[in-house]
Amino acid sequence: MRTRLNFLLLCIASVLSVIWIGVLLTWNDNNLGGISLNGGKDSAYDDLLSLGSFNDMEVDSYVTNIYDNAPVLGCTDLSYHGLLKVTPKHDLACDLEFIRAQILDIDVYSAIKDLEDKALTVKQKVEKHWFTFYGSSVFLPEHDVHYLVRRVIFSAEGKANSPVTSIIVAQIYDKNWNELNGHFLDILNPNTGKVQHNTFPQVLPIATNFVKGKKFRGAEDPRVVLRKGRFGPDPLVMFNSLTQDNKRRRIFTISPFDQFKTVMYDIKDYEMPRYEKNWVPFFLKDNQEAVHFVYSFNPLRVLKCSLDDGSCDIVFEIPKVDSMSSELRGATPMINLPQAIPMAKDKEIWVSFPRTRIANCGCSRTTYRPMLMLFVREGSNFFVELLSTSLDFGLEVLPYSGNGLPCSADHSVLIPNSIDNWEVVDSNGDDILTLSFSEADKSTSVIHIRGLYNYLSELDGYQGPEAEDEHNFQRILSDLHFDNKTTVNNFIKVQSCALDAAKGYCKEYGLTRGEAERRRRVAEERKKKEKEEEEKKKKKEKEEEEKKRIEEEKKKIEEKERKEKEKEEAERKKLQEMKKKLEEITEKLEKGQRNKEIDPKEKQREEEERKERVRKIAEKQRKEAEKKEAEKKANDKKDLKIRQ
């Protein structure tokens, strides 16, 4: 028995050794950041025809001027015009019914069932309550799949902008972007040496603090970035979420291939705002154990963060420039160039697609669009070398709401999510980049861009007589030219040129896609608002007049009551005086009677006269009292009616 057990253990050890040797032999250092460089069996583009037709896309960019002896340059001097080719978009399918079932099987989310409309079928529940967008992907060459994370939200009201909770779900797609439901990946965990079985779609186990009856819980803005792990590319999913006390929103990463290790990032010796988002991740080639982030573009601030405990140091910062716009809002995770090329020592270059947010431009109140960016490290310094104008890849961007036309809503939103893959596909140096993006917070799609590396390698900048030599791509790669003051000024100029061009783009976009209609709609909304304000003003004036009338009527009633009270008091005094006078007369008569003898008949007559006078006085008082009581009741009734 022991012999058999030893033999079995020996067999297992042999198999693991073969697997390990295979990993070492097949691992390629150039396979980094989601980029496959060999163009062989690990290529994401085995069948180029399956990508569809490529259409021309002209791109204008602005390149920094690195020459101190050049004159002050304008945007035209810094501009670079080139041509890219881009495919139509490919919308990524998502079986929300399948994903819903997975989510509801998890204990923490089981209460969601009670919030769904129970009268609906499952399909109808999905259509009413469940939404998805914001998919970010990377290609895993060793598995021949695209790994994508997307945001799935549940809304009890049936409104995507009013979620109860937000959940991150991982999916895999084949090379042709067909969703693989029920498929799995076996991943060798570098820390435990054990195989981790991952079935897809997969709900990432992120603590959400989901509470029934509360809103806006869960993870948002998922981004996936690749790093070089010990056994191959290792995807890290970055997101923002509320902390356990629900008072702060922070940046996190979760490692799906490392037992879902989750890290929250905190910046040392820095007072972080309550809400954090839009950090842009990237890795240095020689340091895959720490992640770097562009924290912000103005000020340009770069962080270096531990993947173990989340502690971050600010490793580079250029002070905020008040004159420089802050319309750059986040970017796709940055990746290196798709092939190893000679460059200066201790220098590194990344490509990314940041996004702009421009208000009140073109046919929308808010316009979001991608830009192309070249980001450079020289030693411990970082800077932006190139920015393009706004890109829309030839799309008619979905409206945020409205009747389906590009200019039928207040927002026009095209958000770049991630660079899925970038590789050289043939011996001629032709390259293809795949970009995932979202439109109108309601979709996830990919496009393929051809010739971006060639676009960059052919660029040239200022070539005036004062320049020592042209500012071309080879010069960017081979020289170290960072200078704090000059570089800051260059970045300010390049960003200013790019953002001015972006504003020109959105104006043109509006003119060609319904600016007149937008103006008409804005005018109608303005008239409607003015009418509402006028009606509100009239209503207020009417209420003030009514209030004034009631106050005046109240004063009249109070004045009348005062006069009546005074009259009653005067009559009371008069009656008292009459009574007193009568008593005096009676007393006088009685006194006279005692002093003289009076005839009994005369005495009886006088007594009867006295009684008659008393009776008349009493009768008069009674009638006056009844009259006053009747008048008082009538006045009280009238007063009550006025007050009502």
From Swiss-Prot:
Positions annotated as glycosylated: N484
GO terms (BP aspect): cell wall organization; microtubule cytoskeleton organization
Lineage top rank: taxon: Eukaryota
Gene disruption phenotype: Strongly reduces de degree of mannosylation of the core glycans and eliminates glycans resistant to alpha-1,2-mannosidase treatment.
Membrane topology value: Single-pass type II membrane protein
Cytoplasmic side: 1-6
Signal sequence bounds: none
GO cellular component term, pick one: membrane
Protein name stated in the entry: Beta-mannosyltransferase 2
Organism per entry: Komagataella phaffii (strain GS115 / ATCC 20864)
Primary gene name: BMT2
